[in-house]
Each structure stands twice: as structure tokens, then as C-alpha cells.
Swiss-Prot record:
Gene Ontology CC terms: cytoplasm; endoplasmic reticulum; extracellular space; Golgi apparatus; lysosome
Organism, as annotated: Mus musculus (Mouse)
Subunit structure, as described in the record: Homodimer. The monomeric form is inactive while the homodimer is active.
Subcellular location: Endoplasmic reticulum; Golgi apparatus; Lysosome; Secreted
Active site: E334 (nucleophile)
InterPro entries: CPQ, Peptidase_M28
Propeptide: 19-42
Primary gene name: Cpq
Name of the protein: Carboxypeptidase Q
Length: 470
């Protein structure tokens, strides 16, 4: 009875949390009035936090995630595993009591790595750990045997272009942060091919390594020959750099069975809590369901997808119904360049004026430190007030750069966007590697992440007005 009374009070607080004043259809509210409206959500926010972090549903997102990734495993674009996961999630969301659960068809790339190996033949025999990069071609039958040229940058490759023809280029670039260093993974094959190389091997884009290669997407360029490309461990890249500096001749035999097949059908997975007053207006909450084909895809991006599901579950379990529709989208084929999100945008952009906020969790679900946000100054000021509701968790900061692969389409068109900001210290230890498993995940940290995500999504969806764009 006490819990029912508490939920009744939560309902009253939600419904009576503010009243807009309009003149000629244009809001005349002061920021002070908006601030007071948001402050009235304090008890609702505490109810969400208590349920997610301390209450009946603590650890639920972790347990749900573990069941999926232990059952299905990794979920590469075009794979049977991904489609199995999508069907499981479709059933899960229906069983959870969410509304308008449906699948939206998407055409996605289908690439498979096949068998792959690399062996150093000179100056000594050494079997190397490699992971072919997404969309890479395979080697010819029997593989490639070639001498190695080690470079530390694209500039060095250009300076030594006369030495590169017929060689395997090994990039031993220093790690200077993911955003800067990832260019070698994405463009390494193209730049090597331009100077006549027969293959490229790139030091894994990782902040720490225990002899672990890390995969990811790479992109060919029209008019440039396609050559096989893979990532190698930090340890092997650095070793070959040392060997080269001593004047050693390095020879590698590389075999890659990678193949690209015709595009295939997949689906974005959608579920909602329909808005009570403005059902056509939307706060979108998202993560991607696909992963690479190594590890379990728990970190990237199982955690983000499942705290996004949990956000809607928590709102539903408290009996809350926001004024606007809360829409969950689990993207497909994010790792291939946001394919599912791109097609979703094309399908729904006619309603762009109805999107108040687009949210994406795709940077891990370690302990949150705040929210990254992109939007107008007025919208940022409002988001700072919303984040103040999370003082019980000490997660109140609003950072810049709310962009994410799957929501950038909307942000570039002027829709406010937010990404979860958390402690990334360990993220790139495991990112796109065999180490991306449930062992990396922490249920208590996921609880906090889910609470943050749910509070932000619900409050923005329930406020009297959409977030301002200018």
C-alpha cells in the first residue's frame, strides 16, 4: 500500500510539474520559470534513481545484457548472430510491456573475415596475432610474402615512398587518443596502396595492450587499388620498428580469407512509451545492437543498448507516462558507418521538427561523469538544470560534443543531441577486441548509467516545451 501511495505521489508530481505561458503561439516563459519546473522533478528523479541503483531492478540491465551476449555472442553486420539478436530483442521488448514495438528494415553490408594469419619469416620465425579490418579484401590464394617497410606516420610514408613498392607497410604510429590515431586504421590501406604497397598492417588503436589486436572499419577510395589490411598488436608493431631501426630485413607471409558479399536485410529495433499529450513529439534514446565478430560485443555497444532499454523499463515500472513519446531505437550496422541510423534518418527526417532530443550511449557504461551535449545555449542551460536532478549520484556535469555516429544526422540538422559521458580510462583496452566480454562490465556502474539515462530522457520528454533550437 505504501508503494502504491508513493507511485501516486510520483504521478501527481509529474503531471503538475509546470505550466507553460504562451502568447500568440510563442512561449513567453522566463528561464526562472523553466528552472522551477525542472526542480519540481526532484522526487521523480529520486524515484528513478532508487529503483535503478538500490531497488528491485538494480543489476537488471547487466543481467539482461549477459543473457543476450552469452546466448548469441558477437553480432557482426550481415551475420546470422545479429539477426538472431534482433529477433530476441523484438520479443523481449514486447514481453516488457513497451508500446509500438516493431522492426524497420535496413539494407546493410555483409563482410566476413574468414581464416587469417601472419607469420614473420625474417629475421626470425614469429607467428603474429592479427585481426583483419572491416571491408578489407582477402589475399590471393597462397597469400602474400613480402618485405616490410615500417613507418610511424603518413608523412614518413610519403618521404619514403620510393621504398614502398611491393612492400607490406607496417604502421607503428604512436597512440595520441582515439580520434587522432584511428585515421591510420581507416586510411592506412589507401595511403599504402597509393605508393605501391601490396598490404598494410596497422598497430592496433588501443591505449593499452596485452598482445591483443583490435579490429574496426577501414575505407577504400575510388581509383586507388584495394590491398589487404589488418591490425596487429602494439607489441609486434613496436618490435618490428626496433628491428627496422637496427637495419634488419623483415619479411612477412600474410594470408587473409576476407570476403564481401552482397548487401543483406537487417532491422532497426524500435519500442516506445507513447506520449500522453504530444505523442507525435519524440525524445529518442539509443544504442547499437551490432558489434564486431570478436569478443561478445558487451562493451561496444551492448551496454549502451541495454541501458537505453532500461531507461524505458524504469519509466514504465514507475507507472510514468511523459507528455512526449519516449522512443527506443537499437541500431543495426553502426560499426559499418552508422548504416542503420542513416536509413532511419532518411525515413523519419520529414518529422524532424518533432524531435526534442536525440540520445546515444556508445562510449561504454562505466561510471558516468556527466552528459555530453550539443545544442543551443538555451538548451544547454536547460540541460544543466536537468542534470542537477542527478546530484544524489554526483553526476551533474554537462560537457560539449554530444555527437555520436548514430545521432549525428539529426544534430547536423539542428536537433539537440546528447551522449553519455563516462570514465573511458579502460574503454580502449578492450574496444573491438577479443577482450570485449561481460567480464569488462560492472553491474553497479551500469545501474548508475541507466539511472542517468532514464532521468534525462524522462524529464526532457515530460517538460511542457521541447528543447529550444535557437
Amino acid at each position: 500500500m505504501r508503494s502504491l501511495f508513493f507511485l501516486f505521489i510520483v504521478h501527481l508530481l509529474a503531471l503538475g510539474s509546470g505550466k507553460a505561458v504562451f502568447k500568440n503561439g510563442v512561449s513567453q516563459r522566463t528561464f526562472r520559470e523553466i528552472k522551477e519546473e525542472i526542480a519540481n522533478y526532484e522526487d521523480v528523479a529520486k524515484a528513478i534513481i532508487n529503483l535503478a541503483v538500490y531497488g528491485k531492478y538494480q543489476n537488471r540491465s547487466y543481467e539482461r545484457l549477459g543473457l543476450l551476449v552469452d546466448t548469441v555472442g558477437p553480432r557482426l553486420s550481415g551475420s546470422k548472430n545479429l539477426e538472431k539478436a534482433i529477433q530476441i530483442m523484438y520479443q523481449n521488448l514486447q514481453q516488457d510491456g513497451l508500446e509500438n514495438v516493431h522492426l524497420e528494415q535496413v539494407r546493410i553490408p555483409h563482410w566476413e573475415r574468414g581464416e587469417e594469419s601472419a607469420v614473420m619469416l625474417e629475421p626470425r620465425i614469429h607467428k603474429m596475432a592479427i585481426l583483419g579490418l572491416g571491408s578489407s579484401i582477402g589475399t590471393p590464394p597462397g597469400g602474400i610474402t613480402a618485405e616490410v617497410l615500417v613507418v610511424a606516420s603518413f608523412d614518413e610514408l610519403q618521404r619514403r615512398a620510393s621504398e614502398a613498392r611491393g612492400k607490406i607497410i607496417v604502421y607503428n604510429q604512436p597512440y595520441t587518443g582515439y580520434e587522432k590515431t584511428v585515421q591510420y586504421r581507416v586510411q592506412g590501406a589507401v595511403e599504402a596502396a597509393k605508393v605501391g604497397a601490396v598490404a598494410s598492417l596497422i598497430q592496433s588503436v588501443a591505449s593499452f595492450s596485452i598482445y591483443s589486436p583490435h579490429t574496426g572499419i577501414q575505407k577504400y577510395q575510388d581509383g586507388v587499388p584495394k590491398i589487404p589490411t589488418a591490425c596487429i598488436t602494439v607489441e609486434d608493431a613496436e618490435m618490428m620498428s626496433r628491428m627496422a631501426s637496427r637495419g634488419n630485413k623483415i619479411v612477412i607471409h600474410l594470408e587473409m580469407g576476407a570476403k564481401t558479399y552482397p548487401d543483406t536485410d537487417s532491422f532497426n529495433t524500435v519500442a516506445e512509451i507513447t506520449g500522453s499529450m504530444y505523442p507525435e513529439e519524440v525524445v529518442l534514446v539509443s544504442g547499437h545492437l551490432d558489434s564486431w565478430d570478436v569478443g561478445q560485443g558487451a562493451l561496444d555497444d551492448g551496454g549502451g543498448a541495454f541501458i537505453s532499454w532500461e531507461a524505458l523499463s524504469l519509466v514504465k515500472d514507475l507507472g510514468l507516462r511523459p507528455k512526449r513519446t519516449l522512443r527506443l531505437v537499437l541500431w543495426t550496422a553502426e560499426e559499418q558507418g552508422g548504416i542503420g541510423a542513416s536509413q532511419y534518418y532518411e525515413l523519419h527526417k520529414a518529422n524532424i521538427s518533432k524531435y526534442s532530443l536525440v540520445m546515444e550511449a556508445d562510449s561504454g557504461t562505466f561510471l558516468p561523469t556527466g552528459l555530453q551535449f550539443t545544442g543551443s545555449d538555451k538548451a544547454r542551460a536547460i540541460m544543466k538544470e536537468v542534470m542537477n536532478l542527478l546530484q544524489p549520484l554526483n553526476v551533474t556535469k554537462v560537457f560539449s560534443n554530444g555527437e555520436g555516429t548514430d545521432i549525428n544526422f539529426w544534430i547536423q540538422a539542428g536537433v539537440p543531441g546528447a551522449s553519455l559521458r563516462d570514465d573511458l580510462y579502460k574503454y580502449f583496452f578492450f574496444h573491438h577486441s577479443h577482450g570485449d566480454t561481460m567480464t569488462v562490465m560492472d553491474p553497479k556502474q551500469m545501474n548508475v548509467a541507466a539511472a542517468v539515462w532514464a532521468v534525462v530522457a524522462y524529464v526532457v520528454a515530460d517538460m511542457d516545451e521541447m528543447l529550444p533550437r535557437s
